[in-house]
A protein has these predicted regions:
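An N-cap/entry alpha-helix motif that binds or orients negatively charged groups
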Residues: 1-69, 178-235, 371-373, 379
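Short beta->alpha linker loops
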Residues: 32-33, 110-114, 135, 257, ...
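A gly/proline- and charged-residue-enriched helix-loop-helix capping module
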Residues: 101-122, 126-140
Length: 381
């Protein structure tokens, strides 16, 4: 199986599975507890049907959107994700270059494997920064100042990770960062030689945003340990309000799931919220983002940019979310599988296929622009 054989989400997933060591593939692929919310995130779209209009003259399609002051040529962006150079040695550089090519936003995580400055200097597209709030308030301040100095366009504070989700696949496989050379790790290197060769012969793994603060003296740290030991469960609305004031720019909360929290985000001056359950990786049993979208849009959609992620696999999923009132959607696994499968060419192919799906489906819906989409286009079963 090669990149040219990938025509959709499941194909990229399969190619990534073939190329990655099992612990790394399952880190991307897995979720919390029984993975019920993870499964529901995509299945929820199946409970909603599209109602197309015809004879609307749809030769020219404009799928551009503007979110938090950023003009995007397509209504889906590459959500910031951690540890990208573990999945492919080109990591964030591949994702940023591909997003730049397609005129959409990309993000760097606090657990990113390149520095904010390095990415900002090389790519001109809209950039967001996924910020994790740490117990060390000095670290938080340094990270905010570094992001501002790097010219980050959107600060995206993740608010649903005050402790780590119970990701049982990671516990079973022993996933850690950097990839641990245990007996099982050596075995995984051996059965995936090309991944191993690339991992060992390219730039040494690091976490530039955290290198001066994370103790990796024993060589590794588990994701669960990072969340439980370093992130601050005491984070509250007062802390976030201070961050919003300091940032004094586009500020987004990622991980909002309740109307009450959405209203509070408006009150403290946020310019965007991402309706997200972290791809099902945190609280299993929580509602799907798509199911929760409409009531949050109804409550605050005229006061703040409402975005959603979690479960997006198809262009039709994007259109359903936009029809409900989302301004745009974010995707993680949809490009991570492609990154793992083939680096930058993989991410470009994933974005191109998604763009074509959105364009095709807009024509079939009789919509020339995103503004033509509305709830009149939807029926729930």
């Amino acid at each position: 199986m090669r990149l040219k054989d990938c025509h959709g989400f499941s194909d990229f997933r399969e190619l990534a599975r073939r190329r990655l060591p099992s612990p790394i593939f399952n880190y991307i692929d897995g979720a919390a507890d029984d993975e019920t919310t993870y499964d529901r995130n995509t299945k929820s779209f199946e409970e909603c049907d599209l109602i197309p209009n015809v004879l609307r003259g749809v030769e020219n399609i404009d799928m551009s959107v503007t979110i938090m002051g950023q003009k995007l040529d397509m209504p889906i962006y590459c959500s910031p994700t951690a540890l990208q150079r573990v999945f492919h040695h080109s990591g964030e550089h591949a994702v940023a270059a591909a997003a730049d090519k397609f005129g959409t936003m990309f993000g760097v995580s606090s657990l990113g494997t390149v520095s904010l400055t390095e990415v900002r200097e090389q790519y001109n597209g809209p950039q967001c920064y996924q910020f994790y709030f740490h117990k060390d308030r000095g670290l938080n301040q340094v990270m905010l100042e570094n992001a501002k100095a790097a010219g980050v366009d959107v600060m995206m504070l993740t608010v649903d990770t005050i402790t780590g989700g119970n990701r049982e696949r990671d516990l079973r496989t022993g996933f850690s960062i950097p990839f641990k050379l245990s007996l099982n790790g050596i075995f995984q290197f051996g059965i995936k030689p090309m991944w191993a060769l690339n991992y060992l012969t390219h730039k040494k793994f690091s976490l530039p945003q955290l290198d001066d603060f994370v103790d990796m003296s024993d060589g590794t740290i588990s994701i669960g340990k990072y969340f439980s030991d370093m992130l601050d469960p005491c984070m509250n609305w007062g802390d976030v309000a201070k961050m919003v004031d300091f940032w004094d720019g586009q500020f987004c909360l990622k991980g909002i799931m309740s109307v009450e929290d959405a209203k509070k985000a408006v009150e403290i001056g946020c310019t965007g919220i991402v309706i997200s359950n972290h791809g099902g990786r945190q609280l299993d049993g929580s509602r799907s983002s798509f199911d929760q979208l409409s009531e949050i849009v109804d409550a605050v959609g005229d006061q703040i940019d409402v975005i959603m992620d979690s479960g997006i696999q198809r262009g039709s999923h994007v259109l359903k979310a936009l029809s409900l009132g989302a301004k745009a959607v974010g995707g993680g696994r949809f490009y991570l599988y492609a990154l793992a499968a083939a680096g930058q060419p993989g991410v470009e192919r994933a974005l191109e296929l998604m763009r074509l799906e959105i364009e095709r489906d807009m024509r079939l819906m009789g919509a020339s622009s995103i503004s033509d989409l509305s709830r009149d286009n939807l029926r729930f079963r």
